Every structure is written in C-alpha cells, then in structure tokens.
Amino acid sequence: MQAILKDLPDIATSWLRYTLALTRATNREHAEMNDSMMIAAQIALQAARDNPMSLMETMEILQHNQEIAGKATSASQEKLTGYVYDQIQEATQAFFNTLSNNTEGENVAGFMRREADIMESVANFHEQIEKIKDEFGFQFHTSGYKLAHETDTFLLYQVLPTKSGVKVRDDLKPMILVPPYMLGVHILGFLPGENKSYAHSFANEGIPTYVRVVKDIMTNEAVQKTNPDDDCTQTKELCEKLKAKHGQKVTLNGTCQGGYICLMNILSGTLTDVCDTLITNVAPIDGTYSEAISGMPQMHHDFITTTLPNGNKVANGYLLSLGMRFVAIDRENPLVKVLDQISLQKATEQNPGKTVAALFRWLLKERVHLPLEIAKMSSLTFQQPISINGDLPVQLYGKPLNVNDLGKLGVKWYQNYAIKDDLVTPPCATAANRYIKDNKVVECVPFPGGHVAILTSPYNKKSPVNGEFTGKDGTKYRGPVKFQLDVSATTAKK
C-alpha cells in the first residue's frame, strides 16, 4: 500500500492526462460527425420546405433513423463493455503486482502511464493524418506524372513507373483507370512510396497506365452539369487519344462506381473502335443485392443537393459520405471509432504505420460533391435490378444497355470482388454474369479482404495483382495486372 501512496502523484497525473486525451479524442470524432449531420439537416430542411415528403415517406425515414440509433447504441455498448472489462483485468493485475512488490509485472503507476500515453496517441493521431498528406495518393505536380489530355470534365494523367529500371513499354495495351466520382481518385494511388498503389502496380510492369481525374467541381461549371452521356462521349475522346498514341485499343479499369460507368460506356457501343477490354474492381453491377444501401429509404433528390453560388445544383459529398457512414454505423459511430483506435495503438505499440494514417486521410479528406445527374444514375442502380433479359436499369443516349452485348462487341471482362465486402457484396458485383451467354467473356475473381483491400494491399501474398494465386475454393486465379499483361501478349500475336 505504501508503494501505491508513494506513486499517487504520478498515478493522478496519468489519470488526468488519460481523461483529457479521451475527451479530446471523443470530442474530435463527435465534432466530425456532427458537422456532416448539421449539413444534412440544413439540406433536409430546405428540401422539406420546397418539396416536402409524404407522410408515408416521413414515417419510413423516422423508422430508419430509429434502426440506425439502435444499431449504434448496441455497437457502442458491446464495444465499451469489452474495453472496460479488459481495462479492469489489467488494472487489477497491476494493483496486485504493486501490493506484492512484483518487479517483473507492471505496477499501477506504470499501467496508468502506459494508458495515458496510448490515449494521447489516439488524441494526437490527426497529426499523423496531416503528415501523410505528401505521401498519400497521386502527387500530380511531381515528375512522376504527365498530363496527357484534357476534356471539359476530365484530366488524363499518365502514371509513370517508380520501380528502378522499368520503362513504359509501347508493345503493351494502354489502360485508363477510372475512379468513382464520390470517393476521389487518390485511393487508386494510396501510398506509392510504400509499394501500396494499385495504379503503380500496372505502371511498374511497363504498362502504359493513365488515370482519369474529374476536374474541381466547385470551380468548373462543365463538371457540375456532367451527365452519363457526357461521361461516355468524353471517355471516348480519351480512348481515341491513347489509341492514336499507342496503336492499340484501350483497357478501361474502373473501381466501384467507376467500374459501373465503364461498363455502361462500353455497352453503349460508343467505344467499340477504341476499347476492347474491361476490368472492374468491386463494382456494384446490381445495387439491389447490396442490402446495406438498397435498404435505405428512398427520397427525392432535393434531399441530397446543394445549390452552388452560380445556381447549379450538385449532390452534396458530405451528405453522401454520411449516408455511407450510416450503412456501417456499428463501426463508424464516434465512441466505437475511438475505442478501435485505442485497440490499434495498443496492438502496434503506438506505431500504427502509414497505412492507417492514409486510410483515415482518404475517409476524412476525400469527400467531394458529385454532378447531380451522375448521382441520380447511381441512385437508380441501387433501386432497380437488372431486367430479366439483361438490361441495366439506366440508359445512354436514350438506348438500352444489355450486358449480353459484351460478347457481340468483342470485349473481355475481368471482374473482381472482395469476399468480405459488406458494401458491394459478391452477389452485387457478379449479378450480370447469369445473363452473359458466352462463358469466355467474363473472368470472375474473388479477392480476400474488404471493399478497398485490393487498392491498399495490391501485393498481398495471398492474392498478388501481378501474379497467380489459388482461392479458397481451390481454383487458380490471376491478378488484374497479370490479366492485362496476358491480354497484351495475346493481342500482339494476332
């Protein structure tokens, strides 16, 4: 007991440090979420005044909100119970170590000091998020990238190899990476310096690799007014540019919403002369199979729009991001996020590394507004399924888009999905396959992990993007980089 009394000033100081750091961390998470919620409330009030919901719609919203609140509360209670139990166990052990003067174990003062250090690391983690800025994603202002072309809506940058001794090979098919409008482009670059970049995994094999970047929607009126037809027309222009430069048809490589848009553009027949290969990563081909999103109440688009100073309306990125957080509210509510960060700091001995900081930066800093017509198109794909004859629920240039036309258009489709993806579930990503009669058109590949695993860990030993691997079902698969190289080799023989 004398040992505890002797260390009491240190224990009290550590307790105060712990409490202050916990308060800072929880306040930061609450403030970040509340900011998005206040923006959502402001938009909803304006929409309710101009175009009010029906009583039935209002009741559905209230019921959905109740379900979200219940899910968040349940997750918080479960997480907090586990955390408190672990803390009591460790504190009790430290207490008895102190009483018995056990020098081999941690005493109360050491336990409290360690907990305070961990909590301060959590509270100060935003510093790591800011510090990773110059390493995260594409740094288009550097010599590692070249502006290849520009349209009203898009910038096309070439991604140059970072691997020593590798040069761009003109004998390989060129590729355009198409990110989703909503999540931004930088997740495709992630951490090039750490060899964790999906884009550079292609470039470092000598593949002529390009990335399509949406211009700043806040300053570019053409972007604000972009619709799916515009996207297709301008994508054709980009492909024509690369075909003229490299002498081969282009591979479109789309991620998430970007993959769906690439599929639409190809099925329209507009790209027949310039594109013959499609790669999609975790693309929501039939959003009705994603219960997390399709199960959300349907509201008219006034409830997601923001009016810019020039009078144009766009889909608010903060509101759409908040909707995605609600989908995963059991992991995304403020208390659970703080407790998860505590567990991470403990597991990594307060050194979680650059990957975690980069992921947080992507989630917090990459929210952008969307062209309203693009948002409407995406919304429709989660509300209406592919028809019984294979037609997508959306059209281009007023014409239907049938997935079975891929074979007629001579397009090969490499389609991958994430086994543990709860946003774009495997059935959601593979829904079109049953309608495609030619079994040589689609190559369907399962990857371990969640929604962005292939982007943040492209060289995972279990499923390297540039090699072959065996899935849990015993089937041998190849990664998308290997697929692109093989397709290039096949094309060269013709």
Regions found by a protein language model. Give the residues of each.
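Alpha/beta-hydrolase-fold enzymes
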Residues: Q2, D10-F111, G247-Q248, I261-K376
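Short, surface-exposed "cap/lid" segments of acyl-processing enzymes
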Residues: K131-E135, Q139-M218
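Conserved acidic catalytic loop of the alpha/beta-hydrolase fold
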Residues: I217-A222, C232-V250, L263
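Gly/Ala-rich beta-loop-alpha elbow adjacent to hydrolase catalytic centers
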Residues: N253-C262
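Active-site nucleophile elbow and catalytic-triad environment of alpha/beta-hydrolase enzymes
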Residues: T381-D405
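Short beta-strand/loop motif that positions the catalytic acidic residue
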Residues: L409, Q415-Y417, D421
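Conserved alpha/beta-hydrolase "acid-adjacent" motif
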Residues: D422-C428
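Catalytic active-site module of serine/aspartate enzymes centered on a nucleophile-bearing elbow/loop
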Residues: A431-K494
